[in-house]
Amino acid sequence: MVSPVVHRHAAGGGSGGDDDDQACMYALELLGGSVVSMTLKAAIELGLVDELLAAAGAAVTAEELAARLRLPAAVAAAAAVDRMLRLLASYGVVRCATEAGPDGKARRSYAAAPVCKWLAAGSSSGEGSMAPLGLLNLDKVFMENWYYLKEAVSEGGTAFDKAYGTSLFQYLGQDGNEPSNTLFNQAMASHSVVITNKLLQFFRGFDAGAGVDVLVDVGGGVGATLRMITARHPHLRGVNYDLPHVIAQAPPVEGVEHIGGSMFDHVPSGSAILLKWILHLWGDEECVKILKNCYKALPAKGKVILVEYVLPASPEATLAAQEAFRLDVMMLNRLAGGKERTQQEFTDLAVDAGFSGDCKPTYIFTNVWALEFTK
């Protein structure tokens, strides 16, 4: 979906532009947003986005794309590709140039727009991609639970639980659901690469002289985030902390110690503790419990660093606000207690756990912030 903007449509010499026309157009856009998302999903899975990126700015026709991707029924496939890319061009996903072909008919060619960098299925730049996250959110399993949102609101409970009779993480761990679990892990890993790269670019709290020598990553999975952080900041010693069955799968990382346990029982000691996308999984009571354990594990003047989406205090018609509120409703749909929060709400949680109410925020990327709280 795009931000509400004024569109001017013209067909057959006529034009529509009054407020009521535009309001209705916007209503249709909102209601038809799944068409854009699912078309983009297919374009990513077919390899169209990667192929346009590989063209390095050169314009490519739908016929050429169909041939390069060896799509069967080339003529029909090329016509379908052209219609898909024409839609995506209207949303600025790709660029489109139209000229008369040898037969006098309109002939379109396409090139990657800047957004395609973040939609690559096979990103090898090291920056990561948002495509795996999008493919996860648009997967059948994760789309199904949206059909239960109304019931979850009217009857109580969580839409995912109503759809599948179990919680999200229990579902992912069940026999037979390995494809969904793999898709989920790929999405989280790719998204983490994007944000951790930006965290290292903009956040100075890990620098030598910042007072951090031992960094504990709570809920750090198999240690991918600490691998990136300690590679950039070799003066740091890392402690990767997660549930024992997760740590059992963690590969050795130079300068990083893997420890298994529960953040609800105990957190290992360090001069700083990192919580990246942990608190948004939990309700307020659970968050305070986690933060209290972090407080106990820190020395005087030690810091807890929260890396989270931060909601604006009131809704705004901006891409950043829309993404944050969109994610918040995803959490409402999938996880009991899970939610996004404002900076003040994070501050209130930290204060309830004993931390200073002085929050030091650093903007990272795509409305993700690093929020530092001191003991």
UniProtKB/Swiss-Prot annotation:
GO terms for biological process: biosynthetic process; methylation. It catalyses: (2S)-naringenin + S-adenosyl-L-methionine = (2S)-sakuranetin + S-adenosyl-L-homocysteine + H(+). GO terms for molecular function: methyltransferase activity; naringenin 7-O-methyltransferase activity; O-methyltransferase activity; protein dimerization activity; S-adenosylmethionine-dependent methyltransferase activity. Pfam families: Dimerisation, Methyltransf_2. S-adenosyl-L-methionine binds at G219, D242, M263, K276. Gene3D superfamilies: Vaccinia Virus protein VP39, Winged helix-like DNA-binding domain superfamily/Winged helix DNA-binding domain. Disulfide bonds: none annotated. Substrate binds at L136, N137, L138, D139, K140, V141, F142. Keywords: Methyltransferase, S-adenosyl-L-methionine, Transferase. It is an enzyme of class 2 (transferase). Its EC number is 2.1.1.232. InterPro entries: COMT-like (IPR016461), O_MeTrfase_dom (IPR001077), Plant_O-MeTrfase_dimerisation (IPR012967), SAM-dependent_MTases_sf (IPR029063), WH-like_DNA-bd_sf (IPR036388), WH_DNA-bd_sf (IPR036390). Induction: By jasmonic acid (JA). Up-regulated in leaves infected by the pathogen M.oryzae. The keyword Repeat does not apply. The keyword Phosphoprotein does not apply. Residues 168-188 are annotated as: Substrate binding. The active site is at H280. Belongs to the class I-like SAM-binding methyltransferase superfamily. Cation-independent O-methyltransferase family. COMT subfamily. S-adenosyl-L-methionine-dependent methyltransferase involved in the biosynthesis of the sakuranetin, an inducible defense mechanism of O.sativa against pathogen attack. PANTHER family: O-METHYLTRANSFERASE. This is Naringenin 7-O-methyltransferase. The lineage of its organism: Eukaryota, Viridiplantae, Streptophyta, Embryophyta, Tracheophyta.
